[in-house]
Amino acid sequence: MPTGRAAIFKGPGIPFEIREFPLPNVEPDAILVRVTMANICGSDLHLWRGEMQPPAPIHPSGYVTGHEMVGRVAALGQNITTDSLGRPLKEGDRVVYTYFFPCGRCYACLDGLPNACPTRFTRFGPRRSDVPPYFIGAFGEYYYLRPGHYVFLVPDELSDEIVAPVNCALSQVMYGLELAGLRAGDTVVLQGAGGLGLNAAAVAREMGAALVIAIDQLPQRLELARQFGADEVISLQEYPTPEARVER
């Protein structure tokens, strides 16, 4: 029986366990992906440090965490012939997919707010490693896309390094700026130039913002913000109060 390895999370501060699991049987409308690259998101660190609550109580068997990833199709369900945009899909193709799984039928989804779907995390299946499909996070050799999960082909010109974080930081800021109604010629102020802020600077610039301002206390982040598209940067060390920053 074919198997794959995964890192099992059992709780904050507990070392991950590398374990081997049988590959799940692929349902007719599901996809099994061989993960080629996974990133460590800031939320992964917060979870391991105990600084944030997991989406559900941690089962004694633990589960696979991580959500920033890219991979290649290892097995297609018999009913799957295309990605979510209707493009032909076959084994070996490189794909990326959302890390949440909205139902598409609730009030939030129908109102264009899939991020507020109450079942966007529970639809992955049981968060435990003692029952299939086992591979429900990025920190495993495989990832199981359940029936109905969004999946998209990756252009050859984009590297795994670029694509792996797309379904987290990049998609979050794109959605956030669209939700905020950013239009060409607007001014955007970014409160923080971490991973999300840097992506937001680049996206705001691409969306036509006339002025992008980044605020942070770390000089190296402010320098990166300029490289990512910020026109002006404001240091919290130099301007510590809101009044001083507004005057600046």
Which sequence ranges carry the predicted segments?
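Cytochrome P450 core scaffold surrounding the K-helix E-X-X-R motif
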Residues: 43-49
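Surface-exposed amphipathic alpha-helices with a cationic face
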Residues: 178, 201-206
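Adenosine-nucleotide cofactor-binding segment
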Residues: 187-190, 205-248
